[in-house]
Curated annotation (Swiss-Prot):
It comes from Oryza sativa subsp. indica (Rice). The lineage of its organism: Eukaryota, Viridiplantae, Streptophyta, Embryophyta, Tracheophyta. Mediates both low-affinity uptake and efflux of sugar across the plasma membrane. Residues 8-92, 131-213 form the MtN3/slv domain. This is Bidirectional sugar transporter SWEET12. Residues 284-294 have a biased composition (Pro residues).
Length: 300
């Protein structure tokens, strides 16, 4: 009866863990469509890959079929995620991810396995150490999203914190916690307590910041106020610097009157369009008069 219950809980845990593994699929589909990783980070996926690799090694030592199956799938899928990330990441992010994968997923994992296989002869001791290391990195998997949590709090947006990943991560932590208790495997049960706490924290943040309109309205109002103040300051500076609206004085008025009374010079002819032809009176001179007649002269 107990074995059947343990197996049933393990199956449920595998299903939920599989959903957790598939939760970032929309995220990486978005990366593929936009050909850009935007603000997404590779650290959680590299840590998740290392955790799956360590648990796979632990499952091989303990002959736990349920842990073996789900962590094999986890290694494959997390590797695909990192491959997609490397294809579309900027140069700096790609270089950082490559260094991280080489140092952590290759060098560190190889060092752990080699040390346990070569230096620890007792099988029970090897299982205990492998379980402790696996539990430590399982905690790192749950702590890795803290960078995303900080980003959510700073930007007041859950755009880069996938909801379904947080949701299924929380459920998976609950199920694997009970699986560890039933199996009396505290290396499995202990890290999932922290996983439950961080999962609940992410769910709370999602509820608080899920309304982008409300958050953007506050941000837009503050931004609009800053723009308004800045515009007023710029307007005041323009008014002070512009000679067209400089304060008037007596000398300026006199100069303006003299300039208005001065006739147009040949160098500046008046614009014909500005003349009202209806108000112009043309002075036409009269026709020339004939010269007066000479008086008649009588001839004697």
């Amino acid at each position: 009866m107990v074995q059947a219950l343990v197996f049933a809980v393990g199956i449920v845990g595998n299903i939920l863990s599989f959903l957790v593994i598939l939760a970032p699929v929309p995220t990486f589909y978005r990366v593929y469509k936009k050909k850009s990783t935007e603000s997404f980070q590779s650290v959680p996926y590299a840590v998740a890959l290392l955790s799956a690799m360590l648990w796979l090694y632990y499952a091989l030592l303990t002959s736990d079929l349920l842990l073996l199956s789900i962590n094999s799938i986890g290694c494959l899928v997390e590797s695909l995620y990192l491959t997609v990330y490397l294809l579309y990441a900027p140069r700096q992010a790609m270089a950082f991810t490559l260094k991280l994968v080489c140092a952590m997923n290759l060098a560190l994992f190889a060092a752990v396995v080699a040390a346990l296989q070569l230096l620890v002869k007792a099988t029970d001791r090897r299982v205990t150490l492998a379980g402790g290391i696996g539990a430590s990195f399982a905690l790192a998997v749950f702590v890795a999203p803290l960078t995303i949590i900080r980003q959510v709090i700073r930007t007041k947006s859950v755009e880069f914190m996938p909801f379904w990943l947080s949701f299924f991560l929380t459920l998976s932590a609950v199920v694997w916690f009970f699986y560890g208790l039933l199996m009396k495997d505290f290396f499995v049960a202990t890290p999932n307590v922290l996983g439950l706490l961080f999962g609940l924290a992410q769910m709370v943040l999602y509820v608080v910041y899920k309304d982008p309109k409300k958050n953007s309205a506050v941000s837009e109002a503050a931004a609009a106020q800053q723009v308004e103040v800045k515009d007023q300051q710029q307007l005041q500076m323009q008014l002070q610097a512009s000679p067209a609206v400089a304060p008037l004085d007596v000398d300026a008025d006199a100069d303006a009157d003299l300039e208005a009374a001065a006739p147009a010079t040949p160098q500046r002819p008046a614009d014909d369009d500005a003349i009202d032809h209806r108000s112009v009176v043309v002075d036409i001179p009269p026709p020339p008069q004939p010269p007066p007649a000479l008086p008649a002269v009588e001839v004697a």
